[in-house]
Amino acid sequence: MSKTKMTEEKILTKHPLGKSGKNLSMQTYDLFKHAIQSLLRDRELTHNELMGRLKKNLKGKFSGNISWYGETVKLDLEARKIIERTNSKPQKYRLKS
């Protein structure tokens, strides 16, 4: 007997403060991860700038709540030390070098 529906690959996200992560589909995670990394490639952005550009870039490409998924993946990327917050006021995000 074969499965008619393949099980979707998932990832359990991490949180920089050790809080519990969220289970996301790998496809959704990768979409947001690449979008965030692309936005931060040559610049530092505040939280509002990052989320605003993420919404603009993914509108029409993703039907879920872009802010929620964006925040979840951003926190995961911080926990994995892929991106970091600056000490500036307001805080900005950047790729870790």
Give the role of each language-model region:
Residues 1-34:
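Long, low-complexity, charged/polar intrinsically disordered regions in eukaryotic proteins
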Residues 40, 58-62, 81:
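Short amphipathic alpha-helical interaction patches enriched in hydrophobic/aromatic residues
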Residues 62-79:
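Short amphipathic alpha-helical interaction segments
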Residues 25-44, 74-78:
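Positively charged, polyanion-binding regions of nucleic-acid-associated proteins
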Residues 78-88:
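A short, conserved structural fragment
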